[in-house]
Amino acid sequence: MLGVARMQKLFVLAVSILASMPGLRASTLLQLSLNDMIRQSTSIVRGKAQLAYVAQKGSVIYTHYQIQVSATLKGTHATTVDIAVMGGVANGAHQLVAGAPELINGQEYVLFLWTSKSGLTQIIGLSQGLFRISTNSSGQALLRRAAATELMLNAAGQPVTDSDYQMSLIGLQTRIQDVLNGAAK
């Protein structure tokens, strides 16, 4: 069985290779459970997104967003976080990466983030690590993520179907503490 760090490196490498291929529009996602994302994330934050800039690094175009952090659920607190999402338009070149999330300016999210050794911070699992926040009629914050439409494989390499995901922010905070304290498997 592959270790978490090795699986994460292989996933990032595979997505980077796929993204660098001109004209390629398909992605294959490694299915991550909520507990996987909690464990593998270097930080989990709640905040509002603002488009910052687009830059090319090697053959990959990244769209950068500035996240105005209102709460840190895991990791070291910062008031802002710069995140990079694969894909965008730079120097007249358009690069589309299937499975890469699109953030909306001013929208509030919970983001599961991973920072590489080079300092590049990305959403873990592409769209899997991005949850949109809304409020229900009683004022409770709810997190929602639509099912990924891209091909998704489990850890054994078998195709699986993703599903929509919804939970309360309070439920997520409890789950994070349980996972980090070893109470959740």
Stretches found by the model and what they are:
Residues 3, 10-11, 17-185:
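Transition segments tied to proteolytic processing and entry into folded domains
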